[in-house]
Amino acid sequence: MLSTTTIGFPRIGNQRQLKFAMESYFKGDSGEAELLAVAHKVQSDAWALQKAAGIAVIGLDGTLYDQVLDTITWLGAIPPRFKHLSGLQRYYAMARGGAALDMSKFFDTNYHYLVPELGPDVLGPATAGPPLQPDFSGPLDKLARGQAVVGRDGAVPILIGPVTFVSLSRGCELPLDQAVARLLPTYCALLQQLAAAGAPEVQLHEPVLATSEGTGMPTEFETAYAQMAQAAGSVPLHLVTYYDDLGAAYPWAVQLPVAAVTLDFLGPPGAAVPSQTLALLQQHGFPADKRLGAGVVDGRSVWKDDGTAVALLRALLDTGAVSSDRLVVTSSAPLQHLPYDLGLELEAPKTPEATAPAARAGRPPGFAKQKVEEIVSVARLAASPQPPLLQLVMAPWCSCSGCSRARAWRTTPPTSRLSGSAAKPYDVRARDEQLQLAAFPTTTIGSFPQTAEVRRLRQQLKSGRLTQAEYEGLIAGHIAHAVGVQEALGIDVLVHGEAERTDMVEYFGMQLGGMLFTRAGWVQSYGSRCVRPPLVVDDITYRGPSTCWEYKVAIPTAAQPVKGLLTGPVTILNWSFPRKDISRAAQAMQLGLALRQEVAALEAAGCTIIQVDDPALREGLPLNGERWASYLSWAVDAFRLCTGVAAAGTQVVTHLCYSDFQDILPAIDRMDADVLTIENSRSDKPMMAALAAAGYGRDIGPGVYDVHSPVVPSVEFIKSRIRSFVDSGILSGRYDRIWVNPDCGLKTRGWPETIAALANMVEAAAQARAELQLAGGAAVAPVTGGVEAAGKGGAGQCRRNQPLRGLLPLSCLP
């Protein structure tokens, strides 16, 4: 049997114990001791599970919020505004305080990390040493606890490598090599202490190597790893990479002074370009003095392996570059991106809402626990000359032939968009046919607080204690309340509050054909927030309106316009577990077509402003920049397929979450949305400056306060944000096209803080109008768009009818 290891596991617990412990601590209902007890138990259980499955060497994963924040803490790279605090108070202030660290997506995943700040006040000026205040108690304590659970020989610390850490940071004024050099003494000191504590090896995770930027960092890596290898002494260093192949970095990366290198042999599920790792190894070989960690069990997909893993391992052995005693089987990425245990799903009681995935298509998929077992099975089978259990263990489930019934027009890149009159450009439709609002119009992103009462109603519906009619009647009351609050506050464009939605992707997954959803398939998004990604198992089809009822409930109680709220096709795809038998592009087009029909249904119900959130657009970018153009082409086409049916008088809004957008602004412009709202509250001026410099010319809502913090922003704070938008020069002074809104949905906030924050937001917008001597007050200006204007151009007068490559044939459009 080949050796095995793990490089990460879900950190929240099999029943989300850590999530609930954190939330209790945040509310003040429990103390530090209770939180740590739960966290340590969750970690110990995960390590014990991996040991029981037969894993030889276990990566000691686990965090109280975020692994990058953990690194900031043990490095002592603390921004000055937090240094007056200590312990967990400081840790969580950096995560969710009033001036918290920025948040961004971790490479191309749906996990959010806290962005390190490495300016001169953290790393020190160029001529001085770093004022770091390292604290190694966390990593050393975790190692000691891991050794107690799995033994000294099997407990391996996991650290984010120094080059990746600096690459993830912001505010650093030093060149990359100098910034890394500032951190190396602290890394070396920790490695020495881990060695003294008996660590058998140390995993250093460097996913930046899989990016285009990483290929240009050989000097930084060689210098850093030479110093760390010397400091570690006899303790081996294990370089771990994942999320894609290393491309041009492979030849020099595998020669770094480490004892082992783990490589991703699979890449992103459904990617247009398959992983090139095996080809790179066949071309360049592999050092004879190193162990190879073969990431052949898919750590980002729930589908069972179809024999690919064993075939890859045998191909590796056949090259002669790696002997069986130097080959270690592992996952292609940390298993934190998967739900915890399929067994929990199969044991859950069946309800009208959720059915165990096995009920749909025979053999079930595998979650993190099953992937650990698969690692062991693959290691055993690959070493066997005649693996009799291969077909049994590796039988495909829905990842290949089981899903190949897609009609040609659903999987073949479509060729055209729609017929009708000539396109109306943004300036014409915005001026002549859409809502005309006061300067600095106010709105929210969509969701309002999800109270215990709302969650209880959903649970009662699932359990049969409420009928659908009873449930809808009670939800209608919550919608009326949300609308009433907004009108009382003077908000210009309203939302219904999304009381009926558990999650922006899961909700639509339940409404569309071809998708399955779970009851226990929770995955950490950030901190205490968890999501349940749907599983795409078949052609995605439209089964009827899913948002029109809520819109119609909101309208009678609203004097102001109400937005229709949808999740966009790329976000649904990127935040689901996609199929592997057809491309992601084909699945995105299926989603675009289905959502297109929902846009048409909302318009038919009288909706004249429709928000299609596609916050995951950027995170789906391939790590290799050479593959960006292809991805952005089909991703934007899918969005436009969804929204292109809207009339010129219907204002289309989109929302993009924590990401850096400067390098994809042309693609954002090609989306052709009338209003762009972005999660900019923690990024502040750089994003606005980039948009202004690029000549962005459509309506924009940059986000005036951070909804991820419970702190209520003051009127003056929000006003300062509005002034910064004006000062950026964006839109050349067209203040009527700068929207004032929170930076994201309000689902996780409480009602008191929500009302207080929104009241301050409305007042700040009114004061900004007055100070800039603009007309409009706090009320909505006369509407020249609206229901009457939606059909102004006559039947078939759609917003953007220019031909698009890669869209559906005319015969397929509704």
From Swiss-Prot:
Pathway: Amino-acid biosynthesis; L-methionine biosynthesis via de novo pathway; L-methionine from L-homocysteine (MetE route): step 1/1
Residues noted as binding L-methionine in the record, renumbered to the chain: I445, G446, S447, E498, D613
Catalytic residues identified in the record: H708
Catalytic reaction list: 5-methyltetrahydropteroyltri-L-glutamate + L-homocysteine = tetrahydropteroyltri-L-glutamate + L-methionine
A single GO molecular function term of this UniProt record: 5-methyltetrahydropteroyltriglutamate-homocysteine S-methyltransferase activity
Cofactor: Zn(2+)
Domain of life: Eukaryota
Annotated positions binding L-homocysteine: I445, G446, S447, E498, D613
GO biological process, any: methylation
Residues that hold Zn(2+) according to the record: H655, C657, E679, C744
Chaperone as UniProt keyword: no
Assigned keywords, A-Z: Amino-acid biosynthesis, Metal-binding, Methionine biosynthesis, Methyltransferase, Transferase, Zinc
EC number, UniProt record: 2.1.1.14
Gene3D superfamilies xrefs: 3.20.20.210
Chain positions recorded as 5-methyltetrahydropteroyltri-L-glutamate binding sites: K19, N110, D503, Y526, R529, C530, W575
Family: Belongs to the vitamin-B12 independent methionine synthase family.
Function: Catalyzes the transfer of a methyl group from 5-methyltetrahydrofolate to homocysteine resulting in methionine formation.
The protein's name: 5-methyltetrahydropteroyltriglutamate--homocysteine methyltransferase
